Amino acid sequence: MNLTATWNADYIDAQYERWKSAPDGLSQDWRYFFEGFELAVSDKSTAEKTIDKDWLERQARVQALIYRYRDLGHLLACLDPLAACPIDHPLLNPSAFNLTSEDLDLEFVAPRFSKSGRAPLRTIIQALKETYAHSIGVEFMHLQDPDERNWLLDRMEPGRNKSKFDHTVKRRILDNLFEAALFEQFINKKYIAVTRFSLEGGDAIIPALNGLVEHVAQKGCGEIILGMAHRGRLNVQAHLLKRPYEDIFSEFESCYDPDDLSGSGDVKYHNGFLTDLQLTQSSSLRIFLINNPSHLEAVDPVVEGFVRARQDIQSDQKHSKVLPLLIHGDAAFAGQGIVTETLNMSQLEGYRTGGTIHLVINNQIGYTTLPEDARSTRYSTDVAKMLMVPIFHVHGEDPEALVHVFQLAADYRWKFGKDVVIDVVCYRRYGHNEGDEPYFTQPLMYEQIRQRPSLHQMYAEKLLEEQIIQKDIIDDLEKTINSRLNAAYDAVHGSECPFPFALFYENWEDIEADYSPAPIDTGVKEKTLISLARKLNKVPETFTLNPKLERLLQRRLQAVESGYGIDWAGAEALSFASVLTEGAPIRLSGQDSGRGTFSQRHSVLVDTQSGKSYTPLNELAENQAPFRVYNSLLSEA
C-alpha cells in the first residue's frame, strides 16, 4: 500500500485548524509542515492566503518521503567495503510517494535542510541521501522519546551527518591508520603465523577510538573502562593505551614463559593494561583494558560492574566521570545471551552506568560462519533496539565518518544517559587467526579481500588528492614508524630473555601468590550487638508495618537480647550492621535481594498504607557506610 494513500485534503485541513488553535498539540514535524506553508504564502495578500490543496498534498508526500528516509535510509546506505553501493531502493524511490520528475524543481518545506526553510525537491532528496544513505546508516526512528529523536535530527540533518575536519585532524587520522597497519604488517613478518588476531580490515577503529578519548576528556571524563575480545586487542593496546612495543614483542619471544609469573599463564591477547594518558598540559585520562578470557562477551558485565563501582566510589551521580566502552564482534553480539542480559541491565537502578558505548567490529563472519547462518535478523545489532537507543552503521573504510559518529555517540550518551551502538562494517584480512585458512570455506570473499588495498594506503591517496599532504610526508611517516618498530624489536630480540610488563596494578601490585594473612578477630562485643539489634528491629512511629513482620522483628530482638534462638537471617543482619557502622559499605544485588527468596531477610520494609520503603540498615548511625540493596533482572540460565 502506498504510504500517502491515507493522506487527503480534509485530513490536512483538520490538522491545519488544530495547528492554528493549539500548535503545541501537534508533533514537531506537523508544526514545521504548517510553518512552512505559512512561509510559502506569506508574500501573498490576505485575500490570496487560502490553502492550496494540491500543494499541500504534494508537501504531505514530500514529508512522508523525508520520514521514510529517516526510518529506512540505512537500507540504501553504502556500508560494505566488499560490495557495490546500493543505487536505489523501492521503498525510498520518490515514485513510491507519487512524486514525479515534474516535482523535482518545485520548492517544499524542509526546515533542517535549508536555512530559508524551503528547498527544491531535488535538493531535499540529495540532502536525505547524504544524511541517511551515504557512509553512515542510522536506525533511530524506533526511539519512543521525541526529545531524543529531535535531538538526533538537529545534530544530523543540518550538517548532513558529517563533520568538517581540518587538516590537523585528517593528518592525525592518517598517522593512526599508518601506525595500526604497519604494526600488524611488522609482526606478520617477524613472527610468522603466530596468533595475534590481527585488526587488519578494521583499522579505522584506531583513529575513531583516539578521537573518542579526546572528545570525552573535554566533557570531564577521567576514566574509560574498556572491555573487548581478542580481535585487534594488541593493536588497541599499542595505539590507544600507548603500551610500549617492547612489552608487546616480549610476549612473542619463545623464551617468555607466562607460567613463571604468579597469577598469570594466559595468552598475550587476553591480558589487560592500565594507562594514564596526558592529553594536554592540564588534561589527562585513564584507560583500563580489563583482562578477558576466550569466552566471548564474558567481560561485558565485569566492565559494567567495574564502572558502577568507580562511579559509586567517586559519588558520580551524573555518570560523567567514568565511561564504559565495550568492543564486540558481530557474531558474538548477536549470538551470546550475555550481551542481551547486559543490555537489559543498562537502565536498571542497581546497574545503570549512564550509558555504554558499544563498538561492533563487524567483519561479516564468525570464524567460518556467515551471517545468514548466525542470526535471524538483518543486522547483528538488532538486539539493541529493545533499549530504544540509536544504532549507527558505518562503512569500515571511511575513517572520517567513524570519527564523526563516535563524537555524536558520546554526545548522545552524555545528553541522555543511555547506551549507543556503532556497527563498523568491515572485514578481516586473514582467517579467524593467523594460522587459519579462510580459502577453505570462503574462497570468493577472501580472493576479493586479498586484492583489496589497505585502508592506510587509500586514505593517503585521498589526502594527496585533497592536497593536504605530499608524497614525501607519507614516505617519512612510514620510515619513522618502521624505525620505531625495528628499534623495539631489536631491544627485545637481542636481550637474553625479555621480561614483560607488570600484570598487577596499583592496589593489586603487592599481591603475592604465597601470601597468607594471619587469622584476625572479627568478633563484636555483646552490648554492641544488642544496641544494633534494637535499631534494626524497629520502625518509625508513623510507619505502618505488616503485622506478620512486626512479630518477626520482635522475635529477632528477643533472640539477641536473650542470647538464644538467633536465626540465620537475624545473624546476617547483625553482621551487616556491624560492618556498616565500622565504615565499610555493603551492596546486595540479585532477584529478591531486598526481601530474600525464602522470605527470610526483609532488609527493606514496606509501609502497608503508603507503599513507601524503609531500610533499617541505613538508619544505624550518622557516620555509617551506606547499605545498598537492589532487586535484579531474572538471570538463571
Show where each model-derived region lies.
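Conserved phosphate-handling catalytic cores of large alpha/beta enzymes
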Residues: 366-377, 385-421, 425-431, 439
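Extended, charge-enriched "interface" segments that sit outside catalytic cores
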Residues: 37-205, 221, 529
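Active-site pocket-lining segments that scaffold enzyme catalytic pockets across diverse folds
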Residues: 182, 186-246, 551, 557-558, ...
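Flexible, glycine-rich loop/tail regions that form catalytic "lids" or insertion modules at the edges
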Residues: 57-67, 74-109, 123, 147, ...
